[in-house]
């Protein structure tokens, strides 16, 4: 298996050179004119920070919404699930940020998107300093907009083999420079097929090994949620844009429980765990853009939000353990950006400011009051341009971050330089190098001072003394984009110095306390490759990808290493009104701290038929699998060794029907492009 994967990697690395012979089709097609690299007949244009993708007419016609379109683009190193409505990196490469005409897009925005109005997609796999830490990919979908007319539509997705679905209704009305849009989404899930199993080996203080198994025998997982959004925008295509967006969302998980059998060789016990919650979150987003002459522009954005969360936890293993959480979070985020398109480069500079207040009160068997305040001021500047065959992007960001919680507080500065150089070797063949360093901050929840019991032996403990770690990245990639072949190889070496790593502390009472501490370094070396081939242009395309990953976790308490492999592929066929899709990957395996995990493999098949204003699709997930593994993992501590797995009968052979209907009328003009994003307010800080 390993030898085969190495051969696959070498083949991918060789493909860019061999693909240069592909000339006969390129001579007949027109070129795509861009300010970046121009590739004859290619629907993909290489940029310093990623790819500019122009979807084909067949892809637009065959897509029903934003997720459907993204799934057909075979984006490198991403898994797009249009049934579950998720976009996930194939490795731990940071989060994916999706935007619509520059503004951060919600699920509702993507579901109400008309693919036929999409002009291009800016796929950024190398985000600059103006994006927040931890953002690995940015997908900006740019569309046309109607000046007069209306749009009504519905996107209904419901599983027939299990209780799971999401239904969206939307409407837009345009008059001259104004647009009013309404969107309502209802999500539901009520499943009984989730099962977990666990075997733990505890080394006690007296040196004895205490073996325990916990196997789930029954359970129920429910989630009901609604989201309503109203958006007004006023835009003159040449000079200004104003947009106001008010959204209100909420959900609850009533009646969630799981029944287990506990065995330790002498005792067999049945017990139940309960985890129910409800949440409510209103958000107001105000945005303004103004064009100053031909080359300059200013952008401003303010987002205010609040999150109200009530949670109840119960664990019947051993003695009864129950607690409640009353959580409140308020946040305000603002950003301003200045951009000047000079020759031969573009200069951008700006500032971001955010402040949040969190008040989480734990009662019952957990007694804690977490009052946390976080603030950040971030200044950045970036230059991007071209000189002959060389494209470049250089930027620097400086941030002042503050945090306080009762007797704990810190105030520190971070420095984030980033440099990217891109060289055009030949037409369509590019090489790129990126260097970046920044400080990474732990999640809100892990810096609280709460202590939560996981089971009769284990506890999760927050650590308010956690300090930011230093991340250093060196990335090299080479890619080729031709008329029928696109391929590339990405090599990354990442170091996380002074990382917050997992620590298990054994108490005199033989309890095991999990926390995070700054005790070492985590390194990762990754090689990832992909190749896409249009077997029959506009009708049949095939994509293959593979990767080799090496992890190093070195701390003052332990050392863990891992080599893993991931591979997969997809196929798209456009046959008139019919569209056939298939996707498969083997999941991905990693080790971080003392936790080794493997996400389960994914297999999807889909067929859709479009007629007039309607489209009907059928999807099957995890075919021929009764209980597919969703995740496996291990705890590698010297005093606590554990293996666990999660399976789902509901996801096995899951069949989902999707119906889309759209009625529209109007004329289109230049798109709105909003360039500010805010998403830090989504953390609640609840453990």
Task: Give residue ranges: language-model regions.
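Face-selective signature of the C-terminal outer-membrane beta-barrel domain
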Residues: 225-251, 274-408, 412-417, 424-428, ...
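Outer-membrane beta-barrel signature, preferentially recognizing the C-terminal barrel domain
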Residues: 410, 427-429, 439-488, 495, ...
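N-terminal periplasmic accessory domains that precede
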Residues: 36, 66-71, 85-88, 108, ...
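Outer membrane beta-barrel strand-and-loop segments of large Gram-negative receptors
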Residues: 331-335, 378, 463, 467, ...
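Transmembrane beta-barrel wall of Gram-negative outer-membrane proteins
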Residues: 163-190, 206-256, 280-293, 569
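Extracytoplasmic beta-strand/coil segments of soluble accessory domains associated
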Residues: 67-103
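Short, acidic, small-residue-rich periplasmic hinge/interaction motif at the N-terminus
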Residues: 21-60, 83-84
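Short acidic/polar hinge/loop motifs at secondary-structure boundaries
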Residues: 101-128
């Amino acid at each position: 298996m390993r030898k085969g994967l190495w051969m696959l990697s070498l083949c991918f690395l060789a493909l860019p050179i061999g693909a240069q012979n592909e000339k006969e089709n390129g001579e007949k097609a027109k070129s795509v004119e861009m300010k970046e690299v121009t590739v004859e007949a290619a629907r993909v244009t290489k940029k310093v920070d990623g790819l500019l993708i122009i979807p084909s007419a067949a892809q637009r016609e065959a897509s029903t919404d934003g997720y459907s379109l993204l799934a057909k683009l075979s984006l490198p190193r991403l898994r797009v699930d249009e049934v579950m409505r998720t976009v996930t990196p194939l490795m731990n490469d940071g989060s994916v940020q999706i935007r619509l005409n520059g503004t951060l897009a919600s699920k509702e925005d993507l579901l109400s998107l008309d693919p036929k109005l999409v002009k291009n997609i800016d796929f950024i796999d190398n985000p600059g300093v103006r994006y927040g830490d931890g953002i690995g990919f940015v997908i900006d979908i740019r569309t046309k907009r109607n000046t007069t007319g209306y749009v009504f539509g519905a996107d209904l997705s419901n599983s027939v083999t299990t209780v799971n679905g999401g239904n969206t209704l939307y409407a837009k009305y345009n008059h001259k420079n104004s647009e009013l849009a309404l969107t309502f989404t209802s999500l539901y899930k009520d499943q009984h097929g989730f099962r977990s199993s666990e075997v733990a080996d505890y080394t006690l203080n007296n040196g004895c090994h205490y073996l325990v198994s916990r196997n789930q025998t029954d359970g129920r997982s429910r989630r009901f949620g609604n989201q309503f959004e109203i958006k007004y925008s006023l835009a003159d295509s040449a000079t200004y844009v104003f947009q106001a967006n008010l959204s209100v969302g909420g959900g609850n998980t009533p009646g969630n429980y799981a029944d287990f059998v506990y065995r330790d060789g002498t005792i067999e016990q049945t017990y139940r765990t309960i985890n129910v919650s409800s949440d409510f979150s209103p958000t107001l987003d105000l945005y303004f853009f103004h064009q100053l002459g031909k080359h300059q522009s200013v952008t401003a954005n303010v987002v205010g939000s609040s999150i109200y969360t009530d949670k109840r936890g119960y664990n019947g293993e051993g003695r009864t353990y129950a607690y409640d959480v009353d959580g409140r979070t308020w946040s305000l985020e603002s950003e301003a950006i200045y951009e000047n398109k000079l020759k031969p480069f573009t200069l951008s500079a700006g500032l971001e400011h955010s402040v949040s207040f969190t008040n989480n009160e734990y009662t019952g068997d957990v007694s804690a009051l977490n009052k946390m305040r976080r603030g950040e001021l971030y200044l950045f500047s970036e230059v991007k341009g071209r000189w002959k065959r060389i494209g470049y992007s250089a930027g620097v960001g400086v941030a002042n971050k503050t945090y306080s919680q009762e007797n704990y507080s810190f105030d520190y500065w971070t420095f984030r330089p980033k440099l990217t150089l891109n060289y055009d070797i030949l037409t369509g063949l590019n090489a790129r190098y990126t260097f970046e360093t920044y400080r990474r901050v732990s999640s809100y929840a892990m810096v609280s001072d709460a202590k939560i019991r996981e089971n009769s032996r284990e506890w999760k403990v927050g650590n308010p003394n956690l300090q930011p770690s230093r991340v250093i990245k060196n990335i090299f990639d080479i890619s080729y984009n031709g008329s029928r072949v696109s391929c590339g190889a990405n090599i990354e070496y990442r170091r996380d110095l002074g990382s917050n790593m997992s620590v298990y502390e054994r108490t005199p009472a033989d309890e095991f306390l999990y926390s995070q501490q700054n005790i070492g370094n985590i390194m990762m070396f990754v090689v990832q490759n992909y190749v896409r081939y249009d077997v029959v242009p506009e009708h049949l395309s095939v994509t293959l990808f593979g990767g080799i990953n090496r992890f190093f976790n070195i701390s003052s308490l332990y050392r863990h290493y891992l080599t893993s492999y991931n591979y997969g592929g997809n196929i798209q066929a456009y046959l008139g009104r019919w569209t056939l899709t298939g996707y498969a990957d083997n999941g991905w395996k990693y080790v971080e701290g003392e936790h080794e995990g493997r996400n389960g493999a994914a297999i999807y098949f889909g067929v859709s038929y479009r007629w007039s204003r309607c489209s009907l699709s059928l999807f099957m997930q995890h075919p021929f699998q009764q209980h597919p593994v969703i995740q496996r993992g291990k705890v590698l501590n010297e005093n606590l060794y554990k293996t666990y797995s999660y399976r789902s009968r509901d996801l096995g052979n899951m069949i989902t029907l999707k119906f889309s209907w759209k009625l529209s009328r109007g004329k289109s003009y230049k798109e709105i492009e909003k360039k500010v994003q805010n998403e830090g307010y989504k953390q609640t800080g609840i453990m």
